[in-house]
Structure formats: C-alpha cells, structure tokens
C-alpha cells in the first residue's frame, strides 16, 4: 500500500538530515527546506557560521549516524576523517592534571564540519523519498493552535510564495529557529527559556601539520581549572582530513582570546595552563587567519512544558537546546533527539498526542548534555544565568565536590574513566555513574601515578623532535 503521509523538515544541517533519513521510513515523502544554497562538495555554506571551528562527533552520536545512515563512517574515514580512540588517542591536560592514556573506551570522529555535513547530506539524499528545496525561507505555519498542517514558504530568488502541506513539520533550524515567533502567530504562549552564558569566546585557525605528524597523531587539549576563580581558558588541537590541524582556543568572560594571528599563538602558548598546543603549532604552517565566534550561550526552550501543543509539529536540535560548542555535544544530542522522535513514532504512529509526546521525549534526550555543559559553565566568574533548574541552583558546593572527586579519579582509575568517558561522549546517561562498580572505584581513588609531563608516546615525540619544538 502506498504511504501518502508527508513530512516537512525545516533546516538541512546535520539534525535536519538525520531526522529526514529517519522519517523516510515512516512517511511517503520528506521535503527538506533550507534558506541556503548547498555546495556541491565538502565546502562551507552561509547558514553554518560556526563551521570554521572544531566540531566533534562523539561516539554516542556517531553510532546513531551509522544506524540511520549505514556506511557513513567508512565514507568519512575514506575521505580523510580521523577515528580517535578515547582516552588512548588523546593527550589531555584536565583540571586535575594529565589524563592517563587508558585503552580505548569510546571514540570520536574528527574532521571538518564541511566534510561531515556534506557526507551526511549525500548519504541522506540517496533516499528517493527525500527532496531538498534550497534558497527558500519559511514564512508561517499552516493550521492553528491545535494542529499544524504544513508551512508557507517563499522562494528567495523569485519571491514566489506557496504552501507546503504536511502531516508532520519538524523544525531543525538551529539557534535562529523561528518556531517561537511562528507559534505566537498561531496564538500559543512563549515557552519557558533557560540560559547559562559564561561569555565564552572562541577562536580557530587551520594549520598544515608537520609531515611526520599528519596521520596517527592524538587529539591534544588543555583545559581550564574551574576551581581557580579565574576565567576559563582552553586550547584544543584536532587532526582532520588532508593533513591539517584545526586549533581552537577559548576563554570565558574576562579571558577572551585575541583575534589576531600573533595574539592567537601567544594565547595558545601562554594563555592556558600548559603551553603544549602553542608549542605544537609554533612550526606548523598556518593555512588561515583567525576566525572568532561568540555564539556559545547554553540556551534551552521548554516547548515540552507548554500547557498545549499543536499536533503535527516537533522542534529538535539547537532549535530546542543549544550548548556551548566547546563541549562538542550539539550534534550527538541532536542524534539522540532523532531517536527519541523515532521511538514515539514507533509507539504511536500518527495518532493524536504524537507531537506532544515526542517533544517531551526530546527534552529528556537532551537533558544530560544540558547538565554537562551548564554545570561546567556556571562556575566561571561573570557567568550570567536564567534558570530554575535545581541541579544548577541548589547545593552547588556539594555537587562540585563530588564532581571534582570523580574527575580527579577518572584521570587515573580506568573503571571511573570508562564511565566518565561514556557519559561525556553521550554514550551513556548520568545514571551510569551510580553503578556500584563505578562508585566503589571512586572510593578507591586513583590507581596509577599522575603523569608529570604530557603523555606523548615515544613514536609521537619522535615525529615532532625535528620540527615542532615540543616540551615533553
């Protein structure tokens, strides 16, 4: 029997493509509408202003991408993306010292955002039931406060307006989502909004890696110590395709990185707690100038708490919960949201109550990422907040002491590290930290000596001795 149901997805980024690939299994046609023109290859586009900065697809999200779009991981790796084991493939100076490089517990896919988006888009659009409509903006939702029945759109070139009916509209348009305004036009109230704003600014530059370090080189990161009472300053070096390093430095309010090339190098060397990243890039070849971004506010819109919610509309991705990009959780949280919607479709099909149930399930799906990001940011000087979340506002001192104990132990205890890494990669939930074996390991404390210098392996040091000037 022919499936006559249709869906419209607003936004053709990562979240939009993933949800489209999922919806194509439940409806007869999916129309993806985006205001941008998409590049023919792995190039940047206007609608992803942060695409020049480092993006991480943690294993918790990568597995979902592979489940929805089988073969995507191999295609990314074939195009030069790096699969980096966590923690064995990273050299990380945490707030508690150098992380011991235990055997792989999770992983990340490291590549440019342009390559990642293009690959996922190409894989998604192989499905003939999915159509991409470019250079088109959404003007209004069709329907009323009880049911959304489609969208009214305008072609940006011709100016022509038309209506696109749909059984389900999914908004994945990101931080600039129009849903709040569009729902108000239907007579619905504004959702409760939370934000945690550390004032973080981050700056990024691309480098050509030294030839000997162009492959099989670890992710290198230097993190702030939130206990110091100073702005949080960080530096991350991530190997990506084509023998390049993407290097991002960041600082919270009062510790923002400079925008000039010399200032960037100085910040990477002297502005963070260890000069390793600065030393690594000192003799690498710069490929770009510095790009800065201030779009780092953690912001959450609680559509799930509205007293009424229209049938036929779901909001997910950054449009419902956007995180400080320094933690790399946005894409993986969006992937979990797609699974939450899929679960509700499987249980309810298109019966009444689907959209409300899905919106509530999405709120649950993004909650761990929300707590992980905001509980870190809220402790920095000058952080501005609007939240009633008791996990952030009550007993903060006691919670921080527990977090610090777990964080310290995770650097030198493999059992605790595996649990912490699973949580931080969104491969497991907060509840996993309450496992009796993990709690017992926390009580035992660190089990290996603390590294006193960057834990680069002999082969990694050997590849750098001739050119990178690294203190090891």
From Swiss-Prot:
Specify the protein name. Putative epoxidase LasC
For this protein, the Enzyme Commission number is: 1.14.13.-
Cofactor(s) required, per the database record:
FAD
Q: Which InterPro entries match?
A: FAD-bd, FAD/NAD-bd_sf
- Superkingdom of the source? Bacteria
* Molecular function per GO: FAD binding; monooxygenase activity
Is this entry keyworded Acyltransferase?
A: no
Q: Organism source for this protein?
A: Streptomyces lasalocidi (Streptomyces lasaliensis)
Extract one GO BP annotation from the record: antibiotic biosynthetic process
The phenotype of cells or organisms lacking this gene is: Deletion of this gene abolishes production both of lasalocid and of the minor cometabolite iso-lasalocid without leading to accumulation of an identifiable intermediate.
What keywords sit in the KW lines?
A: Antibiotic biosynthesis, FAD, Flavoprotein, Monooxygenase, Oxidoreductase, Plasmid
Q: Name one Pfam family in it.
A: FAD_binding_3
Record keywords: Transmembrane helix included?
Answer: no
